[in-house]
Design a protein with these regions (language model features):
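Long, compositionally biased non-active-site segments enriched in small/hydrophobic residues and glycine
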Residues: 386, 390, 401-406
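Compositionally biased, intrinsically disordered/low-complexity regions enriched for serine, proline
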Residues: 3, 13, 383, 463, ...
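Short, intrinsically disordered, low-complexity terminal segments
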Residues: 7-8, 14-18, 436
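Bacterial N-terminal signal peptides that target proteins for export
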Residues: 1-9
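Cysteine-dependent hydrolase recognition
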Residues: 14, 21-388, 396-397
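Extended, beta-strand-rich, solvent-exposed assembly scaffolds of outer structural proteins
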Residues: 402-486
Length: 486
């Protein structure tokens, strides 16, 4: 049996113990429907709770009662006004998330989720394909990336932000979602991620992935946060941090369950995102918002039971690592074209942001000419020294202060038994490239007996014969040796 060995580079590179959420309030554009009083009120409330300036508020005008919008109207009345606002307000390059507030259509042409169409373009049904199929060219390149999201990275050959519908059955509930999203940040709440199942064979298709998710939690020492049950959905024994199951309707035992601020919850069924229309009596994303979730996902039309059209249960692990709800949900769905992401994308209960203090100039000081800045930065007690620093002035991105590049020439080494594998960091490589390089070195020299895969900021190593001739486990170690430019 193979033994999985995790190369623990945490203390040897500058790998955070928990990933940092990729966006903050100044990376969000709030979009309101000028034809809806509730939408305008919710947008103003979101700005207030997250401390956003007015330049981050964009108005569009669509029928507030429409459930769907034509592709032509979507381009003219939704996408183009958003792009124009970003350009006119000098926000280009810094908007990584969109929050569309209440009373906007949930779908485009009745068969694409509005957020998906904004994220990576409208995906028409494949010609001559059966009703149950996955549309061609609908793979989300951000899926499973485990990287902080920036729109300018060019995911899916676009520069599009991750869009969320901030929606609920009424304005009051929607405001409560905002409250929970704002309250969740960096709280590290106690509770459980619940990966549950059911006897519904058509919908209970994700349980096979639960052991792989549990393994990742174990490798990071987070097993206490995870509850799994492949065949039923019991009442969660602790506050819900995340919830996954496969049922058309939410279990009645959730009626009095506790949801931690920031909780992501969803269920695999036909049309949980077909709001405001009812769908075969099934529960919807609105039901999750009412119960206490902060983010969710649902499909806007019949997707059939394709697992790739729904969140991968690894979403629990990614959220626990510190990604925000927007990133965790967006990287969890391989083919999201028929779905909508719902709630507050900024919710990030496991983010570990650094403390940043501006030492000079003094607050409210009058400045004239060039002024040096004095900034002190300290790592979060659960995080690591920061590697990304950006300067914003008046709500707009002004300049990057620091970027994470691995020291050129440093040699990353993994030792498995008597086998030594090394990779020398090249110029302009970051941590992720360095991890990929080490994995390449292991695969090139392991003769198929020792293999490795790079997963964002870490490397996982598998050994076919994990014991030596003496029957004992092979010794394993990793190190960084300073190179010519250390």
């Amino acid at each position: 049996m193979n033994r999985l060995l995790r190369s623990c580079l945490a203390a040897l590179l500058f790998l955070p113990a928990l990933a940092q959420a990729g966006g903050g309030p100044l990376n969000v554009l709030v979009v309101v429907n000028s034809a809806s009083r509730d939408s305008r009120a919710l947008g103003a409330y979101y700005l207030e709770k997250h401390g956003l300036p007015q330049s981050h508020l964009c108005s569009i005008k669509v029928d507030p009662r429409a459930a769907s919008i034509s592709l032509a109207d979507f381009e003219r009345d939704v996408r183009l006004p958003i792009l124009a606002h970003v350009a006119n307000q000098g926000l280009a390059g810094q908007i990584h998330f969109l929050v569309l507030c209440l009373d906007v259509p949930s779908r485009v042409e009745g068969n694409n989720g509005l957020t998906a169409a904004l994220f990576y373009g409208y995906k028409p049904p494949t010609p001559n394909a059966p009703q149950c199929h996955v549309a061609s060219n609908s793979v989300n390149q951000y899926f499973g990336s485990e990287l902080a999201y920036t729109a300018t990275a060019g995911w899916n050959r676009t520069n599009a932000p991750i869009p969320f519908l901030l929606t609920a059955a009424n304005l009051e509930t929607a405001k409560q979602v905002v409250d929970r999203g704002a309250a969740a940040f960096a709280t590290f709440p106690a509770g459980a991620f619940c990966l549950y199942g059911s006897a519904d064979d058509a919908r209970n298709i994700r349980y096979r992935t639960y052991p792989a998710v549990a393994r990742q939690f174990a490798l990071f020492g987070l097993s206490a946060l995870l509850e799994t049950n492949a065949v039923s959905s019991p009442r969660p024994p602790r506050p819900i941090l995340g919830y996954v199951n496969g049922l058309p309707n939410l279990p009645t035992n959730l009626a009095d369950a506790a949801f931690a601020p920031g909780a992501i919850a969803e269920h695999l069924t036909s049309c949980a995102g077909m709001i405001p229309d009812p769908c075969l009596g099934q529960s919807s994303v609105w039901d999750w918002m009412r119960l206490g979730a902060t983010a969710s996902y649902g499909t806007v039309c019949e997707p059939c039971a394709f697992q790739e059209k729904f969140p991968d249960p690894m979403i629990a692990f990614w959220y626990a690592r510190g990604f925000c709800a927007g990133e965790a949900l967006a990287m969890s769905v391989r083919n999201p074209y028929q779905g909508i992401w719902v709630g507050d994308p900024l919710a990030a209960p496991f983010a570990a942001p650094p403390s940043v203090v501006l030492r000079a100039p003094a607050r409210n000081a009058e400045l004239d000419g060039e002024t040096p800045l004095q900034i002190s930065v300290a790592a979060h007690e659960r995080g690591a020294p920061p590697v990304y620093l950006d300067l914003y002035l008046d709500g707009r991105h002004h300049a990057p202060i620091a970027r994470p590049f691995a020291p050129v020439g440093n040699e990353l080494v993994a030792q498995v038994g008597t086998n030594r594998f090394a990779y020398v960091v090249a110029p302009a490589e970051d941590l992720y490239a360095a991890a990929a390089g080490l994995a390449w070195a292991i695969n090139a020299g392991g003769a198929g007996q020792i293999t490795a895969s790079a997963k964002a900021d870490r490397v996982e190593i598998a050994v076919r014969q994990p014991r030596g001739a003496d029957g004992l486990p092979l010794p394993f170690a990793v190190s960084v040796e300073k190179g010519f430019a250390a």
